[in-house]
Amino acid sequence: MEPYVTAETLDARARAWLQEISPYNRHPMRLEAAASVLLVVDMQRFFLDPASPTYTAGGPAVMPRVRLLIDAFRGAGRPVIFTRHVHHPDGLDGGIMDWWWEGKCLEGSPESEIVPELAPLPGEKVVLKHRYSAFYDTDLETVLRCLKARDLVVCGVMTNLCCESTARDAYYRDYRVFFPADASGSVTEDLHRAALAGLAFGFAWVSLSADLAAQLAEAAPPGEGA
């Protein structure tokens, strides 16, 4: 499948997406840097390799924006949490997803790894999940409470599945959700655009990665985030 966006067209497309959803994107927020956490959802080879049956065509173009956010959070001394969508090789955790999807990402396989360009640092939390939402049957909520998080920035793939499901679950738990339109990707632009509209209408402030990075930098004490 051909990508609906490239690194060269991303800025223009992202501005168009924000303009399109502006009637719904009516809850502007600024990051509370001291209580913010970045969630990087499923940036794995399984979803970003063009040869994969689950290739996410919009994923490669947004990788630099995800990297921008990772660097911004690390530079501000704020936590970065990664997720990996995996299933046990014995298939016992597949459930309906076995029937719904072609192929699955097996725990321990090379395809299950996060792409090297975005790899977690030693000590950074990696959540292993078996369903779309990073909150479902994981320890993510416990970790966030221990971090005293209030603001969550959700990025990664796919916009309309794991990212949206995670954002919804975060909202249900009373977190403020920030969703950068240019740091998430889906299989088609229609799916991406529809998800952004739903997010803006119901449970997230949809903005741009550079705006969020700038807010972190502005809040950093002198000497940090440089």
Language-model features, listed with the residues they occupy:
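Short gly/pro/ser/thr-enriched loop/turn and capping motifs at secondary-structure boundaries
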Residues: L161, S184-T188, A213
